[in-house]
Regions:
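Polybasic, glycine- and aromatic-enriched phosphate-binding surface used to engage nucleic acids
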Residues: 2-235, 245
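Extended amphipathic alpha-helical segments enriched in small hydrophobics
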Residues: 227-259
Length: 260
C-alpha cells in the first residue's frame, strides 16, 4: 500500500520499497542543495554542419593556408559526445568533433570571427542554406547560439544522457563538449564530483531514481533536471553506500535482487 499523505503520494510502492525510499531521503541531501551546476549540451541548429568526423576535421586542417590558421582552427574544433556515447563509468570515443564557433560571453570573451578561420568558413558555406535560416544561431549564421557556461566545458565534469536505461555517469577531466542529448555536472570542488560519481552510478540510486522519474516504457528513463536534482546524496565520508543509508539485510537483499 501507499500512504497518500506522504511524499510517496504518486508512486505505488510496497512496504519494503517505501522503507528503502524513506531511508535514502532521510540521510541524503538533494542534489539541488549541493554546490554544483547542471547544464545541457550544445544545440547547434544544424549538426551536419557543425558536428564533423575525424576525416572532415583533417580535411579542414589541411585546407588551412598558414600554420597560424591551422593552430587556431585546431583549437576551435573540439571533441563532442552524444547521449548514446555515455556509459556507466566511461564514454565511447565516437571520433566526432564540434566546430565551436561560439558567440562569446558578454564582457568576458569575444565571439568567434569566421574571417579568422577561412577553412572553417569554406566548410560551413557548403551548408549556408541551412545555417542561415536556423533559429538556434548567434550573431551571424556562422556562430553558435549564446552559451553562458561555455567555459565549463573546459572543467572536470560528469556527463549523463538525457534518455538512458540506467543512471550512467562518466567522469571527464578533459576539454570535452556534448550535444543537447547530454547533460553535465560541474563543481568548484572536484571532491564533490568524485563523491557524486560514485553514488550516482550505484544501483541503489538507480532504483531510487526510477521511483521519481518519467519512464519510457520499461526500458528507459528521462533524466529531467527536476527529478535529477531531487536525488538524495549523503555527505562526503562513508564508503559503504548501504551502510550510510541505514539499509537492513532484507532491504539490501531486495535491491540486490532487482534487475535494474
Amino acid at each position: 500500500m501507499c500512504d497518500f499523505s506522504t511524499s510517496d503520494s504518486w508512486v505505488i510502492l510496497s512496504p519494503i520499497e517505501q522503507s528503502i525510499k524513506r531511508k535514502i531521503e532521510a540521510v541524503g541531501t538533494p542534489l539541488k542543495d549541493w554546490d554544483i551546476n547542471i547544464y545541457r549540451g550544445v544545440l547547434t541548429g544544424c549538426n551536419e554542419a557543425f558536428m564533423i568526423d575525424s576525416t572532415k576535421r583533417k580535411e579542414i586542417l589541411s585546407n588551412c593556408q598558414t600554420e597560424e590558421e591551422r593552430k587556431r582552427t585546431d583549437e576551435l574544433i573540439r571533441p563532442i559526445l552524444r547521449g548514446r556515447d555515455i556509459k556507466r563509468y566511461e564514454y565511447v570515443d565516437n571520433g566526432l568533433y564540434l566546430i565551436n564557433t561560439h558567440n562569446g560571453i558578454k564582457g568576458k570573451l569575444p565571439r568567434i570571427d569566421i574571417n579568422d578561420y577561412p577553412a572553417v568558413k569554406a566548410h560551413l558555406d557548403q551548408y549556408w542554406d541551412k545555417i542561415s535560416v536556423r533559429a538556434d544561431k548567434g550573431d551571424t549564421p556562422y556562430n553558435l547560439r549564446n552559451c553562458t557556461y561555455l567555459e565549463d566545458f573546459n572543467k572536470p565534469k560528469l556527463f549523463y544522457a538525457d534518455i538512458s536505461r540506467h543512471l550512467n555517469f562518466c567522469f571527464c577531466r578533459d576539454i570535452m563538449f556534448c550535444n543537447n542529448t547530454t547533460y553535465f555536472i560541474v563543481a568548484e570542488n572536484n571532491l564533490i564530483l568524485e563523491h557524486l560519481y560514485r553514488y550516482l552510478n550505484h544501483h541503489l540510486i538507480d532504483w531510487y531514481y526510477k521511483t521519481l522519474s518519467v519512464q519510457l516504457g520499461t526500458n528507459a528513463v528521462r533524466m529531467f533536471s527536476i527529478y535529477v536534482l531531487e536525488i538524495p546524496i549523503p555527505p562526503i565520508g562513508e564508503n559503504d553506500i548501504y551502510k550510510v543509508y541505514n539499509l537492513n539485510d532484507s532491504e539490501i537483499a531486495y535491491i540486490e535482487s532487482k534487475e535494474l
